[in-house]
Amino acid sequence: MKSHKSVRLISGIVILSVVFTLASTAGPVMAADKEEAQGIVDKAKVTLEEFLRDKNYSWVNEHINKEKGVLIYPQVLKAGFILGGSGGTGVFLARNAKGEWSQPAFYTMGSVSFGLQIGGEAAEVIVLCMNQKAVDALMTSKVKFGGDTSIALGPVGAGAKSNVVADFVSFAKSKGLYAGLNLDGSVVDVREGLNQAYYGKSLTPIQIVVEKKATNPGSSALRAALKKAK
């Protein structure tokens, strides 16, 4: 009987130790994730402003406040190994009928190979959502560009004019220069952990973007920058 009691006692101590360990590490991990999330939002603002200032991307400036939403990736890395895998994390914001921009939801983007035309290893990327179909696709599941939704490279150059017909239109630059980044075949998926860290609770993109179940004042500068576009 004593041996059984000893086993139960030891088991209880082990379980309590695990619980206390998890409790002690959960806070720092969540704080780190929140810091990472805010960093992505801040960098997204910088990326957006760089595109808006660049005359070669005047089409972005002229259309961003006319379209349904935008994906902003401050850095998409080309790994250069294992089939040239590439990817990055960014934010998605949608614009409602009143012209108001939503809170950001976090999304990853990955591809076997993006094939940067200028041979760079990293790029800043903006993808405009041209219709409701594009927004709905991001709200419901992971999206494969060129699958159920179409994507096209956006017009580049001072005074560029073009009637692009696609669900998504992408723009990319690397080291301040045009990067003909082909996103066809790449996959965009929700970064659930960062969404939870940024808003303090588990939320779906619909709850963040459409239902406005949470806010974070850290996104105000990014949203203001979007509003300033022509």
Residue map of PLM features:
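Bacterial N-terminal signal peptides
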Residues: 12-24
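N-terminal secretory signal peptides that target proteins for export/translocation
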Residues: 1-8
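Small-residue-enriched, tightly packed secondary-structure blocks
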Residues: 31-230
